[in-house]
Curated annotation (Swiss-Prot):
Protein name (Swiss-Prot/TrEMBL): Polyribonucleotide nucleotidyltransferase
Subcellular location: Cytoplasm
Keywords per UniProt: Cytoplasm, Magnesium, Metal-binding, Nucleotidyltransferase, RNA-binding, Transferase
The keyword Lyase is annotated on this UniProt entry: no
Source organism of this protein record: Corynebacterium glutamicum (strain R)
Name of the gene: pnp
Function: Involved in mRNA degradation. Catalyzes the phosphorolysis of single-stranded polyribonucleotides processively in the 3'- to 5'-direction.
One matching Pfam family: PNPase
Binding site for Mg(2+): D543, D549
Length: 753
């Protein structure tokens, strides 16, 4: 049974909260929060353990003074992966940790998204959360443990937050005993391999009323979910498909564990007893400014918001904001330290009024700022084969969002090598997402990817990965690049669609096409009743104005990836399930549009490498490689093919054309899958060695024969072998004899014979 216990050591000042997670048939996991021993000078420091082996130190620290000139909350989250956590020395040149891995950056985002909304609005002091991975069981995932540790450190720091955040990873594990699947919290890597779907859920406790009774409930704040890599095959074998209902079930299954983790953190904070600190708050505007702006703009602004084109609408609303600012500034300027401060508040109030108008119109009239209905998708445009020499390319447009997808294929040895604490050391399918500033008509820095780009790329990668063919079916490394050329709502889901198109154009035999859609949710009180309106294919403005946004990607039959963030204290199950079904309808519409252009793999580009496989006995691997790589290097040089050998004896041959590949296959088979040559067969061989009694001639890699000196003179006596043939010389020979030890005797023959 899941439970929370507390321990205090007054002598050493240690306080512990231990949460036991009961997974039924799959045993229990223990999450232990400990404070008082490490990092005592941080405002809050908690060491978090998953069972006994995985250990993370989370610290939260705030600056003494607010940052001047900031109109946002300066929160920074950093995750430090220490290689000593896994008993390893970093593989970099300097043998120390460098910039964070992709996994660490994704963990930072996973922590930031649910924790940021818990801080009081108007806080401008710099807050830094640092999570250091100190010990790591290779069977565990640390990212969700880090959410809980970061929340606990923040909760005891005295900073103004609304409460603790609990995070849990749930895996739907399917095995012989559980053919319909069981949800397992904090799954191991082995259980991950058995699962068909995983979901990370973060939430907090809120007070609710039912009649006269008050009770605590879990409000979901963030969801990250994805299907497993082998989900298609598992579903064919009878496992449940990860449908919209499975997602809803996973959310409900996660709530009891989030409740336990939040209670453990709250109990720890009560026992630590740190007093709440006072921080100056900087609200974006005063009630007086808001009221003045609202009286001025409501009617005209509502009219301007009905302009359908984004640029026209933005230009009109911005021009009107400047007009209102000029009109109200003389009235409020004297109340502020500078005209700039007054101007900033008027603009903030204007944006808040605009948000309120849009939300009200959505709830009462199902109005959208571009004129669509709540379930309508913007105009779609699909094209493939845009980039001349790319192996595969596509252009996917949805309204003003425009994504270019480009696919590159290469040898398996080009897969990404991963030097991080995450399970697995290589990645064959890589998805890279670029978001240049011109995509929104702005200027800015270009170069190395920012955290947002890495996060969007990871989401698109997770969406497509379940339909990527296996290494055996398609022995290529695959790099997919998404270029966001225009942005007005969900470039990440546009990237999923562009990827399917581009991969098909490159000839990749996907198990099924995948599409994605971004959804929004707006809620509010209308005539005393809470109304919810789900929006399909949200614009950038609707994303900012809504209470929840979620992105859903999948095939026609099941979900492959989902990401959800909400500001609400809870979403009724019926509302969420209806929104997921609405997203499915949109996904099917997009898939049909894509299928009209390309509905299966094209023929591979002439510029793509041709990769074939040959299986050789494991015992022959060394012979194929040869001493110091002699044989493999000779094969590469002679045929022009690239050759990669796996530990199981699978040989991958990559060549620019079919003839080179066939030549390499023939030579590999001759060496490692040899058919014994027969007496009378002729070869054009190469003299590899001369001795006093004859010349050794290479017939095939690793297969030599001897031409005796007596056979070299065409019937005449030869004093020295080197007088007739020299090393490196080509010579036409015929097999005269093969003795019982397999030694080959050769005789030279004239080419015309």
């Amino acid at each position: 049974m899941s439970d929370v216990k507390y321990f205090e050591d007054t002598e050493f000042g240690l306080i512990e909260a231990v949460a036991t997670i009961d997974n039924g048939d799959f045993g229990t996991r223990t999450i232990r929060f400990e404070t008082g021993q490490l990092a005592r000078q941080a405002d809050g420091a908690v060491t978090t353990y998953l069972d006994d082996d995985t250990m993370l130190l989370a610290t939260t620290t705030a600056s003494n003074q607010p940052r001047e000139g900031f109109d946002f909350f300066p929160l920074t989250v950093d995750v430090e992966e220490r290689m000593y956590a896994a008993g390893r020395i970093p593989g970099s040149f300097f043998r120390r940790e460098g910039r964070p891995s992709t996994e660490a950056i994704l963990a930072c985002r996973l922590i930031d998204r649910p924790l940021r909304p818990t801080f009081v609005k108007g806080l401008r002091n710099e807050v830094q959360i640092v999570v250091t991975v100190m010990s790591m069981n290779p069977e565990d995932y640390y990212d969700v443990v880090a959410i809980n540790g970061a929340s606990a450190a923040t909760r005891i720091s005295g900073l103004p937050v609304s409460g603790a955040v609990g995070g849990v990873r749930m895996a739907l594990v399917v095995d012989e005993k559980h053919p319909e699947g069981q949800w397992v919290a904090f799954p191991t890597h082995a259980q991950h391999e058995q699962s068909v779907f995983e979901i990370v859920v973060a939430g907090r406790l809120v007070e609710r009323k039912r009649g006269n009774k008050t009770f605590s409930d879990v409000a979901v704040m963030m969801v990250e979910a994805g299907a497993s890599e082998n989900v298609v095959n598992r579903v064919k074998d009878g496992a449940p498909a990860p449908t919209e209902k499975i997602v809803s079930d996973g959310l409900e299954a996660a709530k009891p564990f989030i409740d336990i983790l939040c209670r453990a953190q709250e109990g720890l904070a009560q026992r630590v007893g740190n007093a709440a600190k006072e921080f100056p708050l900087f609200p974006p505007y005063t009630d007086e400014v808001y009221s003045a702006v609202e009286r001025k703009v409501s009617k005209k602004l509502a009219s301007l918001l009905t302009l359908k084109a984004k640029q026209e609408r933005d230009d009109a609303t911005n021009a009107y904001m400047e007009e209102i600012e000029a009109e109200l500034l003389p009235k409020f300027e004297a109340s502020y330290s500078s005209a700039a401060e007054a101007s900033k508040e008027i603009r903030a109030a204007y944006n808040a009024v605009m948000k309120s108008i849009v939300r009200r119109m959505i709830l009462t009239d199902h109005f959208r700022i571009d004129g669509r209905g709540v379930t309508d998708i913007r105009d779609l445009a699909v094209e493939v084969e845009l980039i001349p020499r790319a192996h595969g390319s596509s252009l996917f447009e949805r309204g003003e969002t425009q994504i270019l997808g480009v696919t590159t294929l290469d040898m398996l040895k080009m897969e990404q090598q991963i030097d991080s604490l995450a399970p697995g050391d290589a990645k064959r399918y890589m998805h890279h997402y670029n978001f240049p500033p011109y995509s929104t008509g702005e200027t800015g820095r270009v170069g190395s990817p920012k955290r947002r780009e890495i996060g969007h790329g990871a989401l698109a990668e997770r969406a497509v990965l379940p339909v990527i063919p296996s290494r055996e079916e398609f022995p290529y490394s695959i790099r997919q690049v998404s270029e966001a050329l225009g942005s007005n709502g969900s470039t990440s889901m546009g990237s999923v669609c562009a990827s399917t198109l581009s991969l098909y154009n490159a000839g990749v035999p996907l198990k099924a096409p995948v599409a994605g859609i971004a959804m929004g949710l707006v809620s509010g009180e209308i005539d005393g009743k809470t109304e919810y309106v789900a929006l399909t294919d949200i614009l950038g403005a609707e994303d900012a104005f809504g209470d929840m946004d979620f992105k859903v990607a999948g095939t026609a039959d099941f979900i492959t990836a989902l990401q959800l963030d909400t500001k609400l204290d809870g979403i009724p199950s019926k509302v969420l399930s209806d929104a997921l079904e609405q997203a499915r309808d949109a996904r099917l519409t997009i898939l049909n549009t894509m299928a009209d252009v390309i509905n299966g793999p094209d023929e591979m580009s002439k510029f793509a490498p041709r990769i074939t496989t040959v299986k050789i006995p494991v015992a022959k691997i060394g012979e194929l490689i040869g001493p110091k790589g002699k044989n493999i290097n000779a094969l590469t040089e002679e045929t022009g093919a690239n050759i990669s050998i796996e530990d199981d004896g699978t040989v991958f041959i990559s060549a620019a054309d079919g003839a080179s590949a066939e030549a390499a296959i023939e030579k590999i088979n001759a060496l490692a899958n040899p058919q014994l040559p027969k007496v009378g067969e002729r070869f054009l061989g190469t003299v590899v060695k001369t001795t006093a009694f004859g010349a050794f001639v290479s017939l095939l890699p690793g297969r030599d024969g001897l031409v005796h000196i007596s056979k070299l003179g065409n019937g005449k006596r030869v004093e020295k072998v080197d007088d007739v043939v020299k090393v490196g010389e080509k010579i036409q020979v015929e097999i005269a004899d093969i003795d019982n030890r397999g030694k080959i005797s050769l005789v030279p023959v004239a080419e015309e014979d």
